[in-house]
Amino acid sequence: MAAAASMLRGERVTLRPWTDADLAPFAALNADPEVMLRMSKPLTHAESDAFAARIRSHIAEHGFGLWALEVPGLGFAGFVGLSATVPFELPVPGIVAAPHEIGWRLARSAWGQGYATEGAKLALRYGFEVAKLPQIVSFAAADYLASHAVMRRIGLTLRGEFDHPRLPPDHRSYRHVLYAKDAA
């Protein structure tokens, strides 16, 4: 296990451990149809709380995870961070077995201001420099251009496309793109 990061600070954002005070705004974020448009579905409050519990458990076990994103003036604005492994096979050449994923989900009030990019750069640096990960991947729905732009801005490159195995073929987000970066 890599050393646990208590906080990662950028110029405008902080990635920090979760607190119980984050649960209500996290539930609101996960219930927002705009935020969840490309996910399987909006989450109920109970589903959101269960997801937050899994995130906290992951951080406790691995020393990293999907940290709470704190923005001055907004407070809790979502999450940015790393998952230990992608829980399904990615059928794209050049991807290591059980790769680590970088991801983010932000409240609409935090969209379009560079917070995801700034937070993702902090998480990516932690993943390579502290956790010593060999490769970090990120994927999103093929039509989710804002997420693709963040992936490119943090230095990931397009590696291929795949059909998401956890979504039905008629789901708007069934087709995904995969970006990745290898350790230097």
Per-region residue spans from a language model:
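Acyl-donor (CoA/ACP) binding surface of acyl/acetyltransferases
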Residues: M1-R38, E70-A184
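Conserved GNAT-fold acetyl-CoA-binding loop/helix
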Residues: E34-I55, F64-W67
